[in-house]
Curated annotation (Swiss-Prot):
LRR repeat start-end pairs: 168-194, 196-221, 229-254, 333-364, 365-390
Domain of life: Eukaryota
Ranges of residues in domain F-box: 6-54
Protein's organism: Arabidopsis thaliana (Mouse-ear cress)
Protein name: Putative F-box/LRR-repeat protein At3g59170
CDD domains listed in its UniProt record: F-box_AtFBL13-like (cd22160)
A Pfam short name: F-box
Length: 473
């Protein structure tokens, strides 16, 4: 970097320089303290701290740096040269930065410890969390993978913060979450991954009861098999993502047990992403304002075995997810996994009328049939866009009755497998969908030549578009 460029940066006000430093990792920001006394002073007031042991310990690890995109390339190169002089352990580095900043206001604190090459004593982590909470942090991000931390719970002060607006906790082989007392009056976003609660569902409900303005909740990698019941009851919630772990068994990825009860009392929810083994009961399902839903629910291995044993029975039912499916009736945009189609076939006594559904996506699987699709399309009077992610499915005696549907746009993701069978399915659609105005193919390069001939089968008002899929790029 030449002297002119250095002078251009040095004349910037402190507040702007602190803002620039907030785009760097804390390791890079700390390196600027070697430039001059002024930069050391600035580091004490950087509002965002990001500690990542994998980046700190591996000097050659590449991390996307937003300052490159903002035109500070020379500045970043200078910082990278200076940071080579840093030599200390990861825990000591965190201690030094927190000590330097003292009690200055803090917006975000991110701590990621997953490397394992420089083990961190859990007794060091708790004081770090306490320090940033006292400083009024609004965004706390904890990613911890520590085999040593298995007994004591996370500090309870996390759940008694008057300032937290966003809280992210991702823990593997870590402590339980102790939620005897919860008071998070400003928390709007809560992200929990692979965490365990004391008292399971009771502890989880206690946590939610202490978040009066919560708008977004993400529960990822939750082990539903250890919970006998599960309830989400938050009047202010707008977005919910709940994804359970699927356990491998007999070649399938499924939980072994059905939860007894699963309830949703979320009257203002507009977005739902839900992946879980079906429950025995759904006592309450309140999705009155739901706009978009991505549903992946599945049967247990025992239920799948029972289906196989009773496959010749008419209307074979091995579970009951009817109340949950009925609760989705107001949705406008709906995505269904192959496993969900199986649930509609064997665990749903009725398919409701989807009065508002305008966009439906079906993901296909060669081992799963389309039996419930005819009824689903018939019960969606306002459906305009239908998307098939693949056309291969288990053979049935009947084709899907689609001629009476109101679909105007059909989108199909094609693969190179069993292409002839897929083309025949497309021909059937073109012959039996008189209202179709647009057909869009997302295709693999090797199937292109066979798609051009389909234009002759479409009605004059139907436009056909061919778009290369990402796999072919």
């Amino acid at each position: 970097m030449d002297s002119v460029s250095k002078d251009m940066i040095n004349v910037l006000p402190d507040a702007l320089l602190c803002h620039i430093l907030s785009f760097l990792t804390t390791k890079e920001a700390a390196s600027t303290s070697l430039l001059s006394r002024r930069w050391r002073y600035l580091l004490a007031f950087v509002p965002n701290l990001e500690f990542d042991d994998s980046v700190y310990l591996h000097r050659d690890k590449r991390v996307k740096n937003t300052l490159h995109e903002k035109g500070f390339v020379g500045f970043v190169l200078l910082v990278n040269n200076k940071r080579k002089k840093l030599s200390t352990s990861f825990p000591d580095f965190v201690d030094r930065i927190l000590a330097l900043q003292g009690n200055s206001p803090l917006d975000k604190f991110s701590l990621k410890m997953v490397d394992g090459h420089d083990p961190v004593d859990p007794d060091s982590v708790v004081p770090w969390i306490h320090k940033v909470l006292v400083r009024g942090v609004s965004d706390l991000h904890l990613v911890v993978d520590m085999n040593e931390w298995t007994s004591d719970p996370l500090p309870s002060r996390i759940f008694l913060s008057e300032t937290l607006v966003k809280l992210t906790i991702k823990i593997r082989d870590g402590p339980f979450i102790d939620v005897k007392h919860v008071h998070l009056p400003k928390l709007k976003t809560l992200y929990l991954q692979s965490v365990m609660f004391d008292e399971n569902d009771i502890g989880f409900r206690k946590l939610l009861s202490g978040c009066p303005v919560l708008e977004e909740l993400v529960l990822d990698g939750m082990g539903s098999c250890v919970w006998t019941s599960f309830t989400v009851s938050v009047a202010t919630l707008k977005r919910l993502t709940f994804c359970c772990q699927k356990m491998s068994s007999f070649g399938y990825m499924h939980d072994d047990e059905n939860p007894n009860n699963v309830s949703f009392d979320t009257p203002n929810l507009v977005y739902l992403e839900y992946a879980q083994v079906i429950a025995n009961n759904y006592p309450k399902v309140n999705f009155d304002l739901l706009v978009e839903a991505k549903i992946d629910i599945w049967m247990t291995v025992d239920q799948i075995r029972e289906v196989r044993l009773r496959k010749n029975e008419v209307n074979c039912m091995v579970g009951n997810a009817t109340d949950f499916i009925v609760g989705l009736r107001n949705v406008r945009v709906l995505y269904l996994s192959p496993e969900t189609l199986e649930v509609l076939t064997y665990c749903c006594k009725q398919i409701p009328i989807f009065e508002n559904l305008s966009h439906l996506t079906i993901k296909s699987d060669p081992n799963v049939g389309w039996k419930p699709l005819t009824k689903l399309l018939k019960n969606s009077p306002k459906l305009e866009t239908l998307v098939f992610q693949g056309l291969l499915h288990r053979d049935n005696k009947e084709d899907v009755a689609i001629s009476s549907s109101s679909v105007k746009v059909l989108k199909i993701f094609l693969s190179g497998d069993k292409l002839k069978k897929q083309i025949e399915k497309v021909k059937h659609f073109l012959k039996t969908m008189p209202r179709l105005e647009q057909l869009v193919f997302y295709y693999d390069v090797k199937v292109l030549s066979q798609l051009h001939m389909l234009s002759r089968l479409a009605s004059p008002k139907c436009k056909i578009h061919l778009i290369p899929s990402r796999e072919s790029v």
